[in-house]
Design a protein with these regions (language model features):
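Conserved catalytic cores and adjacent C-terminal regulatory segments
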Residues: 1-297
């Protein structure tokens, strides 16, 4: 009997491995139903505040930045908000790609073949800054002149990063074939590498940008970089794990403000700037002061 159980377990493991290799981990049906039920026919231009949502079109192999400002002036860029949310969450290997289309009053259509926005902008901060900096050029002012950096405040909230130091090595990767780059011991190395690199480079460039204008305090990045276990995984939505993530967030507020070292790329605590909680309070005060200033002519 023990031999049969062992064979059964082995067969189950092999079947599970091939199912992960040959298709997405989830079918996405529940997520799509939930988003459509909650958002209904609400379109992108109807959002209550300005939004910038990245996704990636695998048919044209280029990023698509959904923006409510663009949506107000171009019907083909005004999809249902549910379609946008499904698109930007369609993470390769986890959820299936998503196709939808928009139609304007002239009968013209645009077909979108979308996957997760993280493919193009895992950290969308730079995409948001770009939209704001050119906002006055699309007939919808963001109340900021292009590149008026000293009046631009950027709060970037990361969703957490796993402690990956030592996870992969060149010695090990040198022996990998195509399959191992996609799947290795439950991880997806190629996805991990591209997503982390994308996010880190954005933080590096945005940090450099504000420091070059001597207004580094206008950019506040809050990110936990030491996650491990289930809280480091992107698809564990159990009540227990969500409570753990809440505690991680509370602890993060108590940690010192950190900023990326432009030489090493590592986050380092900044002397004299207090905790993240104190920095958020100060940031709110700065925002309040900015709101009181007269609009740029």
């Amino acid at each position: 009997m023990s031999v049969l159980l062992c064979v059964s377990h082995l067969f189950s493991s092999v079947t599970n491995l091939f199912s992960k290799a040959l298709g997405p981990k989830y079918d996405g049906k529940y997520l799509r139903t939930l988003l459509n039920d909650q958002l209904g026919d609400t379109t992108l231009k109807e959002t209550l505040t300005n939004v910038v949502i990245p996704a990636f079109d695998i048919n044209h192999l280029h990023p698509v930045i959904f923006s409510n400002v663009k949506a107000r002036w171009d019907e083909l860029k005004n999809p249902k908000l549910a379609d946008v949310c499904i698109s930007t969450s369609a993470a390769p290997t986890y959820l299936p790609a998503y196709e939808f289309q928009t139609t304007n009053s002239m009968g013209n259509t645009h077909v979108f073949n979308m996957v997760d926005g993280g493919v193009a902008a895992n950290n969308p901060t730079l995409a948001a800054i770009t939209q704001v900096s050119k906002g006055t050029n699309i007939c919808e002012p963001f109340k900021t002149k292009p590149m008026e950096t000293e009046r631009m405040l950027v709060l970037s909230l990361g969703t957490g990063a796993a402690k990956n130091e030592g996870k992969y090595s060149a010695t090990k990767a040198a022996k990998w074939g195509m399959f191992n780059w996609v799947y290795d011991n439950g991880a997806t190395p190629i996805v991990d590498i591209f997503s982390d690199a994308s996010s880190d480079m954005v933080d590096f460039h945005v940090g450099s940008f504000f420091q070059s204008f001597r207004c580094h305090k206008n950019y506040l990045r809050i990110q936990e970089t030491d996650l491990s276990g289930e809280v480091a995984l992107v698809d564990i939505a159990t009540e227990q794990n969500l409570k753990k993530l809440t505690e991680v967030g509370k602890e993060l507020l108590k940690k010192a403000v950190s900023r990326v070292n432009l030489e090493t790329g590592e986050y380092e605590a900044v002397d004299g700037e207090g905790t993240n909680e104190e920095a958020l309070t100060q940031f709110a005060k700065m925002l309040s002061q900015q709101r009181k200033l007269p609009l740029s002519p």
